């Protein structure tokens, strides 16, 4: 359960502890009945190995590269496509772009929308939810995609790359399997 920076009350902590204890026992019992684990990334395969001591087959999620065509335009803006949730770390991108005063467009909606609207400087545009066509158009016209979250895999960076755009990502999680470092 995610409580953000707020401290949960004693009753909530106790109830959460009991529920999590039950879920751990159920998880261990359930995993022992699994014939074959399938992971969507090496990152997840490593977690399966660590938590359950089991190997897994690796099958990456697909991206429709015929839908996402390379775009050679560069309208000078950076792009972030994400649900606006705490674990997606959109706030970190907004803070960073506020400090460097470069244009950032954020496509997505969610529980952090109001907070991010208050944080965003004049160089940051929050567009809310958009259709696939609008997202594709923005991929094709952006300078680069910003991806600060730690994801199990991360389809968004692949969609941007299918449009010929570079990705600036946090160096952890599944993104490390699809993004080559410039080091």
Predicted feature residues:
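Short glycine/proline-enriched, acidic/aromatic patches that form the donor-sugar handling elements
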Residues: 135-136, 153, 173-178
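Short acidic/histidine- and often glycine-rich active-site loop of Leloir-type glycosyltransferases
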Residues: 159, 172-183
């Amino acid at each position: 359960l995610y409580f953000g920076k707020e401290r949960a009350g004693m009753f909530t902590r106790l109830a959460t502890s009991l529920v999590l204890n039950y879920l751990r026992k159920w998880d261990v019992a359930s995993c022992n009945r699994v014939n074959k684990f399938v992971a969507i990334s090496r990152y997840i395969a490593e977690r399966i190995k660590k938590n359950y001591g089991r190997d897994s087959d690796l099958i990456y999620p697909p991206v429709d590269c015929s839908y996402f065509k390379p775009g050679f335009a560069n309208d000078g803006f950076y792009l972030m496509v994400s649900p606006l949730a705490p674990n997606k770390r959109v706030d970190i991108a907004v803070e960073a772009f506020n400090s460097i005063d470069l244009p950032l467009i954020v496509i997505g909606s969610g529980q952090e929308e109001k907070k991010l609207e208050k944080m965003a400087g004049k160089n940051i545009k929050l567009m809310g939810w958009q259709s696939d066509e609008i997202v594709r158009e923005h991929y094709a016209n952006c300078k680069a995609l910003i991806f600060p979250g730690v994801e199990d895999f991360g389809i968004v960076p692949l969609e941007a790359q299918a449009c010929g755009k570079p990705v600036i990502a946090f160096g952890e999680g599944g993104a490390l399997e699809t993004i080559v470092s410039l080091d």
